[in-house]
């Protein structure tokens, strides 16, 4: 049986949810219908589900969503992750922190002759955020999705490039989230 671990991006990223329907509510309804008629299992970490409920308002659909998606946290205290994963993650963090410092230094030098400090700060924030957050695990929710997919040997469904990059490093199966609806439709057609 196929096991899919879902990230919020399936339902909040317009590029992804529009593969199901034009709006988030319709996308969730279509997902629920397909999920109910497939033989697959679907999981989402509790922290991710909580985050998604704050972002989306789909009313009574939450009950149906919980009927098809098992909401649970990874067993963090029982999981063993490869030491190389942690080593590489720390190395990546150090690289990004140093890159962020260089960006801050560059903008500090520019500030001496700058008339519009507000624009400079906005540019600094943008570049700093890009240097430190893009392409990396940057939240506990990301780590929960990664660990749950690892624990269940599930297929990760996410548009988050950082999450996908790190999942691939530890051997988690991935699908292109833009293909998720077609995969579900195929599972429904071939379920017997």
Curated annotation (Swiss-Prot):
Q: Which reaction is recorded as catalysed by this protein?
A: Endonucleolytic cleavage of RNA, removing 5'-extranucleotides from tRNA precursor
GO terms (BP aspect): tRNA 5'-leader removal
One Pfam family assigned to this protein is PIN_5
Tell me which SUPFAM superfamilies the record gives: PIN domain-like
For molecular function, the Gene Ontology terms on record are: ribonuclease P activity
Q: Would I find Glycoprotein among this entry's keywords? A: no
Q: What is the effect of changing residue 138 to A?
A: Abolishes activity
Q: Which family does it belong to?
A: Belongs to the HARP family.
The entry's protein name is: RNA-free ribonuclease P
Native source organism of the sequence: Aquifex aeolicus (strain VF5)
């Amino acid at each position: 049986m196929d096991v899919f671990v879902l990230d919020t991006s399936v339902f909040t990223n317009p590029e992804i949810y529009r593969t199901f329907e034009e709006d988030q509510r319709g996308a969730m309804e279509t997902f629920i219908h397909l999920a109910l008629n497939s033989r697959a299992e679907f999981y989402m970490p509790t922290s991710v589900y909580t985050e998604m409920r704050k972002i989306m308002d789909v009313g009574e659909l939450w009950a149906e969503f919980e009927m098809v998606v098992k909401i649970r946290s990874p067993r963090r205290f029982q999981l063993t992750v490869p030491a190389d994963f942690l080593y590489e993650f720390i190395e990546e963090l150090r690289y990004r922190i140093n890159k962020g410092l260089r960006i801050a230094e560059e903008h500090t030098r520019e500030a001496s002759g700058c008339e519009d400090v507000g624009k400079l700060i906005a540019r600094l924030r943008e570049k700093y955020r890009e240097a430190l957050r893009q392409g990396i695990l940057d939240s506990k929710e990301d780590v929960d999705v990664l660990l749950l997919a690892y624990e269940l040997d599930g297929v990760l469904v996410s548009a988050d490039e950082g999450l996908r990059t790190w999942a691939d490093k530890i051997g988690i199966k991935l699908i292109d989230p833009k293909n998720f609806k077609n995969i579900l439709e195929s599972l429904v057609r071939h379920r017997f």
